[in-house]
From Swiss-Prot:
Disulfide bond positions: none
Subunit structure: Contains catalytic and regulatory chains.
Protein name, entry field: Aspartate carbamoyltransferase regulatory chain
BP GO terms, sorted: 'de novo' pyrimidine nucleobase biosynthetic process; pyrimidine nucleotide biosynthetic process
Gene Ontology molecular function: metal ion binding
Family to which this protein belongs: Belongs to the PyrI family.
Pfam families listed in its UniProt record: PyrI, PyrI_C
Species: Aeromonas hydrophila subsp. hydrophila (strain ATCC 7966 / DSM 30187 / BCRC 13018 / CCUG 14551 / JCM 1027 / KCTC 2358 / NCIMB 9240 / NCTC 8049)
Residue ranges that the Swiss-Prot or TrEMBL entry lists as coiled coil: none
Length: 154
């Protein structure tokens, strides 16, 4: 393989590749979506060269196929990312991300008075984009927050 075609992060036989993640968001995605808790091998590249982004992060998860719903939740941090499903070292499906209608069990509500902090319920937010700003509305306290406020503690 010539130097020009050499992969910056090792290829995987089967699994999912999260590509075109803005530089610096990869670690947040690993933590928030608990990807580091899997027993499967994860290969990560930070600040890799990217023609479109300048620099990007890349996450490869072996033997794990992200669902469309899981992939779309990533759009909160990497709206231009793609999730590629790999089988026998080849891309068999490429998923362009879309903001999900809701996101459950990932974030904690920033409202300290919200019942989701004291009751055995999963967090649940409706997601909306208004004039380019992503807002998340808690199902329980009905307060709206920007995506960066909801995710700032991660």
């Amino acid at each position: 393989m010539s130097e020009k075609n050499q992969l910056q992060v090792e290829a995987i036989r089967h699994g999912s590749v999260i590509d075109h993640v803005p530089a610096g968001q990869g670690i947040k995605i690993l933590k928030l979506f608990q990807l580091i808790e899997t027993q499967e091998r994860i290969t990560v590249g930070f600040n890799l060269k990217s023609g479109a982004l300048g620099k990007k992060d890349l996450i490869k998860i072996e033997n794990t196929r992200l669902t469309e719903q899981q992939a779309n939740q990533l759009a909160l941090f990497a709206p231009k990312a793609t999730v590629n499903i790999i089988e026998d070292f080849a891309v068999v499906k490429k998923h362009q991300l879309e903001l999900p209608e809701f996101i459950a069990g990932v974030f904690h509500c920033p409202n300290s008075n919200c019942i989701s902090h004291n009751e055995p319920v999963d967090s649940y937010f409706r997601v909306r984009e208004v004039k380019g700003v992503v807002r998340m509305k808690c199902k329980y306290c009905e307060k709206s927050f920007t995506q960066d406020i909801v995710s700032e503690r991660y």
